[in-house]
Regions:
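Terminal substrate-recognition subdomain of acyl/acetyltransferases
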Residues: 2-3, 157-166
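Acetyl-CoA-dependent GNAT
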Residues: 5-10, 14-20, 25-99, 110-112, ...
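Active-site acidic-Proline motif in GNAT/NAT acetyltransferases
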Residues: 97-99, 103, 131-132
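Residues forming the Rossmann-fold NAD(P)(H) cofactor-binding site
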Residues: 107
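Conserved GNAT acetyl-CoA-binding A-motif
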Residues: 118-128
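Conserved beta-strand-loop-alpha-helix junction that forms the acyl-donor binding cleft
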Residues: 127-137, 153-158
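Conserved acetyl-CoA-binding loop of GNAT-fold acetyltransferases
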Residues: 141-150
Length: 166
């Protein structure tokens, strides 16, 4: 998945602690997201996102990756391999810089990711959508993600599970 040309015209790489200032800037550009999912981002919350893992998973299963246009970070994704089962990839977070939204950047990345995961034998992608975040819900549904009917509570909001069969 990490091949540089896979997401052309964007380059992709694993993000590190040295990228936190840039990631935080991207997070801060998305005030609408943090209205649905408080609190506002901080250095510590970015670190938490970079290290967060679901039960029984290790950092080897986690891909906290950045998508770059030239040298500018334009999107961040937290992808967990084989979760919650061996045929599923789980997107824990996907955020596009506010200034790039509405231009097809996010859709392009998700479509390419779907192609890559399919060729690697993955059968579905699963994620959570904050219930009240209607723009996010529309975005994922346009990309053929369907609500599964499962719902869980996050600290400040209800989250709806959605998945796409590959």
């Amino acid at each position: 998945m990490m091949h540089e040309n896979t997401f052309s015209p964007y380059t992709v790489r694993r993000l590190t602690e040295g990228d936190i200032p840039t990631i935080l800037k991207l997070y801060e550009s998305n005030s609408e997201y943090f209205r649905y999912c408080p609190p506002n981002p901080t250095w510590a919350s970015v670190q938490e996102d970079m290290l967060a893992l679901p039960p029984a998973k290790t950092m080897a299963d986690k891909h906290f990756i950045g998508f770059f246009e030239r040298d500018a970070l334009i999107a961040v994704m937290d992808l967990i391999d084989r979760y919650p089962d061996a045929q599923t990839a789980f997107i824990g977070l996907f955020m596009v810089d506010q200034n790039r939204q509405g231009r097809g950047v996010g859709a392009h990345i998700v479509r390419r990711l779907s192609d890559v995961l399919r060729t690697e034998g993955c059968r579905r992608i699963r994620l959570g959508i904050i219930q009240d975040n209607l723009p996010a819900r529309r975005f994922w549904q346009r990309l053929d993600f369907q609500l599964t009917g499962l719902e869980f509570e996050k600290e400040h909001s209800a989250v709806l599970e959605a998945e796409k069969m590959l």
